[in-house]
Amino acid sequence: MTDPTPAQGYTAFSHDGGDVGVLLIHGFPGAPGSLQAWADHLVRAGYTVRLPLLPGHGTRWQDANRTTFADWLGTVTASLQELSARCRAVVVCGLSMGGTLTLRLAELFPDAMSGIVLVNPSVMTLRKDAKYLLPVLRYVVPAYPGIVGDIAKPDVVEPGYKWIPVKAMYTVSRAWPVVRAELPKVTAPMLLLHSTVDHVVEPVNAQIVRDEVSSQQITDIPLPRSYHVATMDYDAELIFTSSVEFIEKVTVGLL
C-alpha cells in the first residue's frame, strides 16, 4: 500500500498576470498536475492564476488521512482571499472534489467571485459502501484501492494517490450533505462541464447541481469523449477554450 515518490505535477502553481484572477482546485486524492495544462492555457490568456496543492496531497496517502475537508477549504479560502485582494475580478474552477470546494466557496463568499467553472463536481454518491461502510471502515483499514486515471485517452497518467485514504474520504462524505443543502445559496454565473461516462462521480451529480443552485446564468456543456479526469482527456481543449470564453463573458464591464 505505497504510492510512488511524487514527481512532476505534485506542486502548487502560481502566476501573476492581469486583473482577472482564476483559482483552480484539484480533486481528491489528486494533485495540481491534473489541472496544469488548464492553468497554462489561462496564463496564455493573460490571467492571474493560482493552483494550490491541497494539504495531505502530493506526498503520501498517509498524509491525507491526517487532513480533512475543512483543511482543504481553509487552503482554497486563503487563495481566494489573496486573489480577491490582488485582482478586480475572480473566477473559481474545480475538478471533482475540487468542484465541491468551489461550490462551498460560492456558498460562503458569493460576493468574492464573478463566476464558477465546474468539471464533474461531486455533491453526493449512490455507492452504498461510501454511504454506510465509511463511518466504520475508517476505524478498520487506513486505505483501499481507488480509481486513478479514469481517462479515456490512452497513455495519459493522472498524478495522485492510487489508494483512497479512508479517514480523509470520510470527511468528504460528511461534507457532501452540507454542500448540497446550501446549493440554493450559489448565485454566481456557472459553467458546468460534465462527462457522459464517468466511473468515479455519478453523472447525476451534475444534474443535482444544475437543478438546485440559484444561479440565473448556467452554461451546460457535456463532455462526450472523456471520462472523469476530463481536464487530461479528449475534451480538455473544449474545457480550456470554453472556460476562457465564460471568464471573458462574466468579467466584462468589471475591469
Where are these regions (language model features)?
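Conserved alpha/beta-hydrolase
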Residues: 43-61
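Conserved alpha/beta-hydrolase "acid-adjacent" motif
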Residues: 199-205
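Gly/Ala-rich beta-loop-alpha elbow adjacent to hydrolase catalytic centers
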Residues: 94-98, 102
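Catalytic active-site module of serine/aspartate enzymes centered on a nucleophile-bearing elbow/loop
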Residues: 225-255
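Active-site nucleophile elbow and catalytic-triad environment of alpha/beta-hydrolase enzymes
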Residues: 165-183, 188
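Short beta-strand/loop motif that positions the catalytic acidic residue
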Residues: 186, 192-194, 198
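Catalytic histidine neighborhood in serine/cysteine hydrolases
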Residues: 50, 207, 211-229
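Active-site nucleophile loop of the alpha/beta-hydrolase fold
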Residues: 117-126
